[in-house]
Amino acid sequence: MIVIYHNPDCGTSRNVLQLIEAAGYLPQVIEYVKEGWTKPQLLGLFAAADLTPRSALRTTKSPAAELNLLEETVTDAQILDAMVEYPILVNRPIVCTPKGVRLCRPSEVVLDLLDHWPSGPFAKEDGELIIDERGNRVYT
């Protein structure tokens, strides 16, 4: 089973979801901004993805700066509390598969988590090619 913690307003998140679906998977899609987070859920995801609250913090287009979360003196516990209160603070998308858990930025990171890929070609919304016409990953 594949789970994607998704924000439909995010181009990277949309690209990752489309890539997963184009590969033939039917992921469980969790719109985390609507559903929110729990501390245990975030701690589990961060541990599995080798992230910390600070490294998973969305610093742009979020209230991180106005909440003073970008200061070096802010602890991971404080960031985690803020993430539970303001789900948009968590960077996205986070994808879970039997191969692991990753913050999939850039979009092509998700390929490392899939057993099979779209047959190709596959391009991001902006036209950047991720998989060529032969089904091979494009490295830029």
UniProtKB/Swiss-Prot annotation:
PROSITE patterns, per this entry?
A: ARSC
UniProt-recorded Gene Ontology molecular function terms:
arsenate reductase (glutaredoxin) activity
Q: Which organism is it from?
A: Synechocystis sp. (strain ATCC 27184 / PCC 6803 / Kazusa)
Q: What is the lineage of its organism?
A: Bacteria, Bacillati, Cyanobacteriota, Cyanophyceae, Synechococcales
GO terms in the biological process aspect are: response to arsenic-containing substance
Q: Where is this site: Important for activity?
A: H6, R58, R92, R105
> What is catalysed by this protein?
[glutaredoxin]-dithiol + arsenate + glutathione + H(+) = glutathionyl-S-S-[glutaredoxin] + arsenite + H2O
Give me the disulphide-bonded residues.
Answer: none
Protein name as it appears in the record: Arsenate reductase ArsI2
Similarity-based family: Belongs to the ArsC family.
Q: What class of enzyme is it?
A: oxidoreductase
Keyword hit for Membrane? no
**Active site residues according to the UniProt entry:** C10
The UniProt record lists the EC number as: 1.20.4.1
The alphabetical list of record keywords is: Oxidoreductase, Plasmid
Keyword Oxidoreductase recorded: yes
The function of this protein is:
Catalyzes the reduction of arsenate [As(V)] to arsenite [As(III)]. Does not constitute the major arsenate reductase in cells: essential only in the absence of ArsC (AC P74313).
